C-alpha cells in the first residue's frame, strides 16, 4: 500500500531493524543442513496516538512479543524460499495485532552461496489488511 492510499491515521510505524537469527532455509542441501544467518527488518503501520496518550503497552505493538514471533519463524521449520519466510512473518504480525493496518518485512540472506561477491540477497514484501 503506498503512502498516498494510507488513511491519515496510519502513518505511524513501529520498526524493528537488523534482527539476526540462525535458520535452515534455502534450496541447496548445504543451506538446510548447515543453516545460516538471516537478518530481518519489520515495519508495522498502526495509529500510535492512543498508546502515546495512555502510556499502555496494550495500546501498541509489543516489540518483545514481535521479536519472539519472528525468531520462532526464522529458527523454525525450513523453507526453500525466503519469500515464504517473509510471508509467514507478515501474516503473523497482522494476525497478532488487529490495530496494525500494514506491514513491510525484509528478509536478508547475507551469506548466500553464489560465485561472486555481494553483501546480501533479500526480499521485501508489503501486506495490508
Regions found by a protein language model. Give the residues of each.
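N-terminal, polar/charged subdomain of small-to-medium soluble alpha/beta proteins
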Residues: 1-129
